[in-house]
């Protein structure tokens, strides 16, 4: 009976790790045909944001420049001009296909992530008892560590998250999350998030040391500051 009680939280933890991957895979497959059909029948009513409109205009300006170039080379044979028109037509069709695939990818991934969040939230509420047991295990494990190891772990974690080289890591993490939701890449938004998110974390961490660690374990705070200096 005791082994079963100990095994249940571990099984719940493993399900929390693999459940998002399974949800993403299954819903991507099941929603793909529906989203594709919906986009192909309703795309004329979809509002494009400024970035999408800019990308579309840039592509069509390139095609317009090619057409102007065509007007400048009238002396070429009719066969050559006909091939040029066919090439422009094919490029236009290819561009429209790429645009449709990008929009379908955005809608599909955003919908899947929302569904995944809702399911995981409900699953966490349903498994509240297992989460309490896992939390008690984690607290017991941390309590048994020495203050030196705790201080070293905190220092390592803070250097990774808010250290000198952390913006490069945050750029990759935020960029991957941004891409996973299917949003259009925007350097200004990513740069703003990368420059502000570590600062917010640093402020919260210092507040946590001031309010919690100073009260619970003053010796740990002393060791941490000694190692940090």
Swiss-Prot record:
Catalyzed chemical reaction(s): K(+)(in) + H(+)(out) = K(+)(out) + H(+)(in)
Subcellular localization: Plastid, Chloroplast inner membrane
Record key words, sorted: Antiport, Chloroplast, Hydrogen ion transport, Ion transport, Membrane, Plastid, Plastid inner membrane, Potassium, Potassium transport, Transmembrane, Transmembrane helix, Transport
Keyword NAD on entry: no
Residue ranges of the TM segments: 7-27, 114-134, 189-209
One of the record's GO molecular function terms: antiporter activity
GO biological process: potassium ion transport
Membrane topology, from the record: Multi-pass membrane protein
Keyword Chloroplast: yes
GO cellular component, one term: chloroplast inner membrane
Principal location class: plastid
Record family assignment: Belongs to the CemA family.
Function: Contributes to K(+)/H(+) antiport activity by supporting proton efflux to control proton extrusion and homeostasis in chloroplasts in a light-dependent manner to modulate photosynthesis. Prevents excessive induction of non-photochemical quenching (NPQ) under continuous-light conditions. Indirectly promotes efficient inorganic carbon uptake into chloroplasts.
This protein's name: Potassium/proton antiporter CemA
Native source organism of the sequence: Panax ginseng (Korean ginseng)
């Amino acid at each position: 009976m005791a082994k079963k009680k100990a095994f249940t939280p571990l099984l719940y933890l493993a399900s929390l790790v693999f459940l998002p991957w399974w949800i993403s895979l299954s819903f991507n497959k099941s929603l793909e045909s529906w989203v594709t059909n919906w986009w192909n029948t309703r795309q004329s009513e979809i509002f494009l944001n400024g970035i999408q409109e800019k990308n579309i205009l840039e592509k069509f300006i390139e095609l317009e420049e090619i057409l102007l170039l065509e007007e400048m080379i009238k002396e070429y044979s009719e066969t050559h001009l006909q091939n040029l028109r066919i090439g422009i037509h094919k490029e236009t069709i290819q561009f429209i296909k790429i645009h449709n695939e990008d929009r379908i990818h955005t809608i599909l991934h955003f919908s899947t992530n929302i569904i995944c969040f809702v399911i995981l939230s409900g699953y966490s509420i349903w498994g509240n008892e297992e989460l309490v047991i896992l939390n008690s295990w984690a607290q017991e494990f941390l309590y048994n560590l020495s203050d030196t190891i705790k201080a070293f772990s905190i220092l390592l974690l803070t250097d990774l998250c808010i250290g000198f080289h952390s913006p490069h890591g945050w750029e990759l993490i935020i960029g991957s999350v941004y891409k996973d939701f299917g949003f259009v890449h925007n350097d200004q938004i990513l740069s703003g998030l990368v420059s502000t998110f570590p600062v917010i974390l640093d402020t919260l961490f210092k507040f946590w040391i001031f309010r919690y660690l100073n009260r619970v374990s003053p010796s740990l705070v002393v060791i941490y500051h000694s190692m940090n200096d």
